[in-house]
């Protein structure tokens, strides 16, 4: 992309890459390493806790952008299970012989327009006030994930293109390294609004911190999310992969706004 972006948090992203060379923030003390898209942060934390309670097995969760994980897995990152926010990355890894099989779709995600408390921009599903705020100067910065490697960032870009706002907003974007960072930019007031995952807007950390509206599904390509076992996967990773498809995990995904296969 040739658009000029406002990049915030570059130093933090660099430090994260140094401390955790194969991903972003990690959760869990032991067990197999799991690479998970950032939109899963709260849902998967709950699911991993339930999995440990039922099986006694812990897993190490690392959250980040799916595109970055794709490249890291290609380069030999020691993950056993990959939960991608874009199933195309899983297909590519499968074609390259780096997975056990083609994986399983576990959910389809949704995106929201979020405005933090104190923002003069209003959340409306038609982007009417977003467009007006762009014209009258109320909207100085809009937070999204980086479309170059974050599926939720691409969906945000597609929604803005659909509404013919992308060109006008391209110099006002605050790009998160992943969708979770973009959400933090929005909720912290670093931007007057943000477009990010519904699953994050529904999390306890965001309760009471702003307003949001669902963005129509037709404004962007479906966020079909797929999990796949990698070649190095062991028994615990395989058990977690199966657990993701069971009712306890599906209930958590549903509560965080994901659309589940078959529903």
Question: Which residues does each predicted region cover?
Answer:
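Bacterial N-terminal signal peptides
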Residues: 9-23
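Exported/periplasmic ABC-transporter solute-binding proteins
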Residues: 25-63, 67, 71-77, 84-87, ...
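N-terminal secretory signal peptides that target proteins for export/translocation
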Residues: 1-6
């Amino acid at each position: 992309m040739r658009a000029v972006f406002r990049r915030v948090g570059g130093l933090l992203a660099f430090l994260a890459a140094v401390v955790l060379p194969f991903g972003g923030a990690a959760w869990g003390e032991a067990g197999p390493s799991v690479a998970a898209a950032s939109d899963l942060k709260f849902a998967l934390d709950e699911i991993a806790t339930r999995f440990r309670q039922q099986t006694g097995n812990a897993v190490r969760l690392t959250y980040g952008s799916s595109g970055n994980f794709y490249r890291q897995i290609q380069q030999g990152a020691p993950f056993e299970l990959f939960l991608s926010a874009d199933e195309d990355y899983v297909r590519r890894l499968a074609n390259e012989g780096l997975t056990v099989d083609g994986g399983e779709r576990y959910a389809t995600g949704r995106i929201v327009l979020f405005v933090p408390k104190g923002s003069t921009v209003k959340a409306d599903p038609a982007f009417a006030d977003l467009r007006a705020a762009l014209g009258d100067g109320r909207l100085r910065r809009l937070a999204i994930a980086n479309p170059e490697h974050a599926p939720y960032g691409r969906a945000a870009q597609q929604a803005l293109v659909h509404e013919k706002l992308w060109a006008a907003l391209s110099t006002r974007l605050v790009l998160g390294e992943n969708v979770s960072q973009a959400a933090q930019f929005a909720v912290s007031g670093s931007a007057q609004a943000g477009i990010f995952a519904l699953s994050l807007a529904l999390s306890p950390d965001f309760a009471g911190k702003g307003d949001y509206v669902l963005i129509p599904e037709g404004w962007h390509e479906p966020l079909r999310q797929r999990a796949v076992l990698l070649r190095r996967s062991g028994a615990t990773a395989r058990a977690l992969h199966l657990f993701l498809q069971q009712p306890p995990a599906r209930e958590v995904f549903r509560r965080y706004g994901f659309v589940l296969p078959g529903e």
